[in-house]
Amino acid sequence: MEKYNNWKLKFYTIWAGQAVSLITSAILQMAIIFYLTEKTGSAMVLSMASLLGFLPYAVFGPAIGVLVDRHDRKKIMIGADLIIAAAGSVLTIVAFYMELPVWMVMIVLFIRSIGTAFHTPALNAVTPLLVPEEQLTKCAGYSQSLQSISYIVSPAVAALLYSVWELNAIIAIDVLGAVIASITVAIVRIPKLGDRVQSLDPNFIREMQEGMAVLRQNKGLFALLLVGTLYMFVYMPINALFPLISMDYFNGTPVHISITEISFASGMLIGGLLLGLFGNYQKRILLITASIFMMGISLTISGLLPQSGFFIFVVCCAIMGLSVPFYSGVQTALFQEKIKPEYLGRVFSLTGSIMSLAMPIGLILSALFADRIGVNHWFLLSGTLIICIAIVCPMINEIRKLDLK
């Protein structure tokens, strides 16, 4: 237990740096959307920007996981933050001399996404080296709260800053945030995994396969991953349809869209705080199942509402947000607890890659059918499918056994 001495100081030091970086990155992300919308007015350009945001994780995730497990995760986290900072610095310098070309913004978005693809699994793999097992779920809850704060703050702050500053000034703030995050990681002593690096298989492909093999050996986690992939496949396209249902079905305005987004993020914040405060609850599969069920019920009710039911829809959005930490946070803690630390980089990169690949497939299907059957009916159909997933999840014996020590 010696490695957990002063774990709170270590975790919250890193957490504070990540808080600054996450919020500044979210602000910049929104500002870039404003910039691309203003300069091009093209839905294709915005779709490309979104695609570049998750493409590296989806395509290169398994290979990145091998590198995270082979090398010092602390150095990887610092390096990823500095790469993000360097990419932003290039944009800042160029913007002083000329108007930023769209192609350059796209390249920087891609580079930032690569940095995130390294940073996220490294951070998830480092956490169980710092935090006692019984505290992992609570820490995941606090991390979810931080993410929701960035969702709430970033649109308003980005809109304010973009109205008074040039884009390069906002980029400079994000560069500073990345530097602060790298400094907080640098000053924390993170336990090492001994001679792990020297003992790794020199065959890169075989190491990637080991990530899947480790998952398949734990039948409960593998089954949970499959359930989660199906859940993301159904749920993620709904994220893109909130503006559509707010304006087209409920006859709202951009203000109504903002209200639904703030409601969702506020619910997510409350859910993360509740998970952080009461994260020692042992029946975690029950929490995951309840989370999925809450999402399904909220979507189903949203799809059944009349066009005058916007207020109830806002309440449903808050419940959806409330449910999110009890799925993603608890699932992350389960993986951190059940997988050996030397494999966590590969496992988290692999799971992130699978989830990322499920997103575009679901988006394509929703784009094909939502307009044909009506966006409200798509919410109803998605909610019904998610309720079915919630019913099936605890019926799988291997998943139920995950709560057993």
UniProtKB/Swiss-Prot annotation:
GO terms for biological process: response to antibiotic. One of its GO terms (molecular function) is transmembrane transporter activity. Keywords: Antibiotic resistance, Cell membrane, Membrane, Transmembrane, Transmembrane helix, Transport. It comes from the Bacteria. Pfam families: MFS_3. GO terms for cellular component: plasma membrane. PROSITE patterns: MFS (PS50850). The chain crosses the membrane at residues 14-34, 48-68, 76-98, 145-165, 168-188, 222-242, 259-279, 285-305, 310-330, 350-370, 373-393. CDD domains: MFS_MefA_like. It is found in: Cell membrane. It is a multi-pass membrane protein. InterPro entries: Drug_antiport (IPR004751), MFS_dom (IPR020846), MFS_trans_sf (IPR036259), TM_effector (IPR010290). Belongs to the major facilitator superfamily. Drug:H(+) antiporter-3 (DHA3) (TC 2.A.1.21) family. NCBIfam families: 2A0121, macrolide_MefA. Confers resistance to 14-membered macrolides including erythromycin and to 15-membered macrolides but not to 16-membered macrolides, lincosamides or analogs of streptogramin B. May function as an efflux pump to regulate intracellular macrolide levels. This is Macrolide efflux protein A. It comes from Streptococcus pyogenes.
